[in-house]
């Protein structure tokens, strides 16, 4: 039961961060691309890469892991919204914008997971066995 409370708390914080990123991403950018969702997903990719390394190195408790990964990052990132927005762009005839959203989200997402993990490994001074290094 306590684990569910940690997930709910992390989820609340992640959702608030996602909303904040969506608001910030709208400032000065053209509404042709769903910038808020893209920003949330890319920030989440970076965070999950780095925090996964730290969790392995410092043996985060199960409660802390579900708070961060299931609750926080799980509610910050949003695959379903990303998929819907990409589909809507395609259905509106904005094929290049839709395909660019898919390509940028996936390629930069993978790159940012790797960069986040690399940053954490650098800060730790080397490979972390539990991360597969």
Curated annotation (Swiss-Prot):
Single GO cellular component term: plasma membrane
Pfam families reported in the protein's UniProt record: CRCB
Keywords in alphabetical order: Cell inner membrane, Cell membrane, Ion channel, Ion transport, Membrane, Metal-binding, Sodium, Transmembrane, Transmembrane helix, Transport
GO terms of biological process kind: cellular detoxification of fluoride
Superkingdom of this protein's organism: Bacteria
Reactions listed under catalytic activity: fluoride(in) = fluoride(out)
Disulfide bonds: none
Topological type in the membrane: Multi-pass membrane protein
Primary location: membrane
Localization (cell): Cell inner membrane
Activity regulation field: Na(+) is not transported, but it plays an essential structural role and its presence is essential for fluoride channel function.
A molecular-function term among this protein's GO annotations: metal ion binding
Keyword Transmembrane helix: yes
TM helices/strands, residue ranges: 4-24, 35-55, 66-86, 107-127
InterPro entries: FluC
Keyword set includes Metal-binding: yes
Annotated Na(+) binding sites: 74, 77
Family listed: Belongs to the fluoride channel Fluc/FEX (TC 1.A.43) family.
General function of this protein: Fluoride-specific ion channel. Important for reducing fluoride concentration in the cell, thus reducing its toxicity.
PANTHER family, per the entry: FLUORIDE EXPORT PROTEIN 1-RELATED
Name the UniProt record assigns to this protein: Fluoride-specific ion channel FluC
Organism: Salinibacter ruber (strain DSM 13855 / M31)
């Amino acid at each position: 039961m306590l684990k569910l409370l940690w997930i709910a708390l992390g989820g609340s914080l992640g959702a608030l961060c996602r909303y904040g990123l969506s608001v910030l991403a709208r400032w000065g950018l053209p509404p042709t691309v769903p910038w808020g969702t893209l920003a949330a997903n890319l920030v989440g990719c970076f965070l999950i890469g780095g925090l996964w390394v730290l969790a392995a190195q410092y043996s985060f408790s199960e409660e802390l892991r579900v708070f961060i990964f299931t609750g926080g990052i799980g509610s910050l990132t949003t695959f379903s919204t990303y998929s819907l927005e990409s589909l809507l762009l395609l259905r509106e005839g904005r094929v290049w914008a839709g395909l660019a959203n898919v390509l940028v989200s996936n390629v930069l997402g993978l790159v940012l997971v790797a960069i986040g993990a690399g940053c954490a490994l650098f800060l730790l001074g080397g490979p972390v066995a539990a991360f597969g290094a």
